[in-house]
C-alpha cells in the first residue's frame, strides 16, 4: 500500500467506541448530519472511490486519516450498506431531521380538523414507509406485502388514535390537544416497527459470540431489539412534540401571532427542527447497535445448542437495527 495512511484502519466499523454512550452519540451526530443531503453526485462518487480504493489497498497521495473517515461517513450516508446502491434522498439518515421537522411541525400546527389529521398522518406514515424501504436489509428484504401491511396498519393506527383523542380532548385545555399528534406517532411506532420486522419475530435474528461467530437465530433477541428500537423512536419524537406545544401555546396569545397567524407553522417547524437536531442522534445512541442478552434468556433449544458448543459462554450479541 502506498500513501501516508496505515493499512489497518477499520472503516467498516464506526470511528468512535460504540461501547460508550458518548462514542455512539458522536457516531450518530455524524450519520444524521443534515448537511450531507446537500452533497453533489460528484462528491458522493469521490467518497465512494476513496472508500473502495482504500479497501483494495490503494490510497491517493496526501490523503489524511480525517479525510478517509469523512469519505467513509459520506459514503455511508448515501449508499446502502448491503447492496452498495445509492439510496433515495429522503430515505437517507441525513434527511431525517429536515423531513421530520417539516412533517412533525405541520402535524402539530394542523391538528384540529379531521381532513388535516388524515392528510398529515398519511404523509408521515408514507415518509416512514420510504425510510423503511430505503434502509431495508439486503439479506432479508421486505416483500411488497409486508411493506404494504405495515404501512396501512400504521396509518390506520395513527389516524384512529389522533381522531379518537381529538374527540376526547374537545372539552379540555387547548394545551392538552396539542399533544394528540405525539400520541398518534407513538401508537404508529408501536404498530409499524413490529410489523415491518415481523419476519424477525417469527424466524429470529442472528446471534453471535463476542467475536462475531454465528451461533443461531433467536426470536427472543428480535423481541428485545425491536423493543429497544420502538423506545428509541418514541423518545426521538418526544422533545420535538412535547416542548413546542408549551411555547406555541404562549406565543399564540401574544400580539405578534395574532397579527401574523401564518407565522405559526414556520415557527413550529423551526422549534421542532431545533429539538430533532439533538434528539435524533442522542436517541439513536441510547442502546448499543451491537446489543446483547444473557444466554439464559434465549429459547431452550438455542440454549442447549450453545451449551454443547460453547459451555462457558454467558452472553450473546446481535444487531438491534435502527
UniProtKB/Swiss-Prot annotation:
GO terms for biological process: L-alanine transport; L-serine transport; one-carbon metabolic process; serine import into mitochondrion. Residues 2-102, 168-174, 250-266 are mitochondrial matrix. The chain crosses the membrane at residues 103-120, 147-167, 175-195, 229-249, 267-287. The modification N-acetylserine is found at residue 2. InterPro entries: Mtc (IPR004686). Keywords: Acetylation, Amino-acid transport, Membrane, Mitochondrion, Mitochondrion inner membrane, One-carbon metabolism, Transmembrane, Transmembrane helix, Transport. It catalyses: L-serine(in) = L-serine(out); L-alanine(in) = L-alanine(out); L-cysteine(in) = L-cysteine(out). Residues 121-146, 196-228, 288-322 are mitochondrial intermembrane. One of its GO terms (cellular component) is mitochondrial inner membrane. It is a multi-pass membrane protein. It is found in: Mitochondrion inner membrane. Belongs to the sideroflexin family. NCBIfam families: mtc. Amino acid transporter importing serine, an essential substrate of the mitochondrial branch of the one-carbon pathway, into mitochondria. Mitochondrial serine is then converted to glycine and formate, which exits to the cytosol where it is used to generate the charged folates that serve as one-carbon donors. May also transport other amino acids including alanine and cysteine. This is Sideroflexin-1. It comes from Sus scrofa (Pig). The lineage of its organism: Eukaryota, Metazoa, Chordata, Craniata, Vertebrata. The gene is SFXN1.
Amino acid at each position: 500500500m502506498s500513501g501516508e495512511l496505515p493499512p489497518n484502519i477499520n472503516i467498516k466499523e464506526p470511528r468512535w467506541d460504540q461501547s460508550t454512550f458518548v462514542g455512539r452519540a458522536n457516531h450518530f451526530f455524524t450519520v444524521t448530519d443534515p448537511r450531507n443531503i446537500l452533497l453533489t453526485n460528484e462528491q458522493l462518487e469521490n467518497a465512494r472511490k476513496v472508500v473502495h480504493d482504500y479497501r483494495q489497498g490503494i490510497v491517493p497521495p496526501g490523503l489524511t486519516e480525517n479525510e478517509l473517515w469523512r469519505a467513509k461517513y459520506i459514503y455511508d450516508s448515501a449508499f446502502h450498506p448491503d447492496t452498495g446502491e445509492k439510496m433515495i434522498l429522503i430515505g437517507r439518515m441525513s434527511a431525517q431531521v429536515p423531513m421530520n421537522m417539516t412533517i412533525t411541525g405541520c402535524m402539530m400546527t394542523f391538528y384540529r380538523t379531521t381532513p388535516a389529521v388524515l392528510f398529515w398522518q398519511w404523509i408521515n406514515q408514507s415518509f416512514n414507509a420510504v425510510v423503511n424501504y430505503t434502509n431495508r436489509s439486503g439479506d432479508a428484504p421486505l416483500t411488497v406485502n409486508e411493506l404494504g401491511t405495515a404501512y396501512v396498519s400504521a396509518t390506520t393506527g395513527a389516524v384512529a388514535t389522533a381522531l379518537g383523542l381529538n374527540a376526547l380532548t374537545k372539552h379540555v385545555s387547548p394545551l392538552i390537544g396539542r399533544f394528540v399528534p405525539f400520541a398518534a406517532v407513538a401508537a404508529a411506532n408501536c404498530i409499524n416497527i413490529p410489523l415491518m420486522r415481523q419476519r424477525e419475530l417469527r424466524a429470529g435474528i442472528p446471534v453471535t459470540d463476542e467475536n462475531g461467530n454465528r451461533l443461531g437465530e433467536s426470536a427472543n433477541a428480535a423481541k428485545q431489539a425491536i423493543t429497544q428500537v420502538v423506545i428509541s423512536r418514541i423518545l426521538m419524537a418526544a422533545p420535538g412534540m412535547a416542548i413546542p406545544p408549551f411555547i406555541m401555546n404562549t406565543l399564540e396569545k401574544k400580539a405578534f401571532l395574532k397579527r401574523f397567524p401564518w407565522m405559526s407553522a414556520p415557527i413550529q417547524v423551526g422549534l421542532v427542527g431545533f429539538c430533532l437536531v439533538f434528539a435524533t442522534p442522542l436517541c439513536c445512541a441510547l442502546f448499543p447497535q451491537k446489543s446483547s442478552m444473557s444466554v439464559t434468556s434465549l429459547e431452550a433449544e438455542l440454549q442447549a445448542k450453545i451449551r454443547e458448543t460453547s459451555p462457558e459462554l454467558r452472553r450473546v450479541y446481535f444487531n438491534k437495527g435502527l
